[in-house]
Amino acid sequence: MWVIAMFDLPTDTPKARKAYARFRKDLLEDGFTMMQYSVYSRHCASIENAEVHVKRMGAVVPAQGEVRFLTITDNQFGRIKVYVGKKRQPTTQSPSQLQLF
């Protein structure tokens, strides 16, 4: 089972940014990893285990904002299609030694 957390939290005030950062930190501490901005996923051994994590994270949702949790099977997760628009250009590699002229 996979739990996917999708959230939209305000960041317009310092207090809201702090709440956003705290929620994101709680997600990471609970074993979630970032799939893309504001979308995090976590693998769970069973539906019961997934429900425990959803309840735990649901209890720390900031007062302002919205969070949705989606529970899907391993098979469904494996069928996720990812499309990437413009690929990032690789950074030029720095020389391993300084060259003096």
Swiss-Prot record:
Database matches in Gene3D superfamilies: 3.30.70.240
SUPFAM superfamilies named among the record's database cross-references: TTP0101/SSO1404-like
Entry's Gene Ontology BP terms: defense response to virus; maintenance of CRISPR repeat elements
Keyword Nuclease found: yes
One Pfam family matching this protein: CRISPR_Cas2
Enzyme Commission number: 3.1.-.-
Keyword Magnesium appears in the UniProt entry: yes
Single GO term (MF): RNA endonuclease activity
CC cofactor: Mg(2+)
Keywords: Antiviral defense, Endonuclease, Hydrolase, Magnesium, Metal-binding, Nuclease
Binding positions (Mg(2+)): 8
HAMAP family in the cross-refs: Cas2
Subunit structure: Homodimer, forms a heterotetramer with a Cas1 homodimer.
Function: CRISPR (clustered regularly interspaced short palindromic repeat), is an adaptive immune system that provides protection against mobile genetic elements (viruses, transposable elements and conjugative plasmids). CRISPR clusters contain sequences complementary to antecedent mobile elements and target invading nucleic acids. CRISPR clusters are transcribed and processed into CRISPR RNA (crRNA). Functions as a ssRNA-specific endoribonuclease. Involved in the integration of spacer DNA into the CRISPR cassette.
Designated name of the protein: CRISPR-associated endoribonuclease Cas2
Source organism (scientific name): Parvibaculum lavamentivorans (strain DS-1 / DSM 13023 / NCIMB 13966)
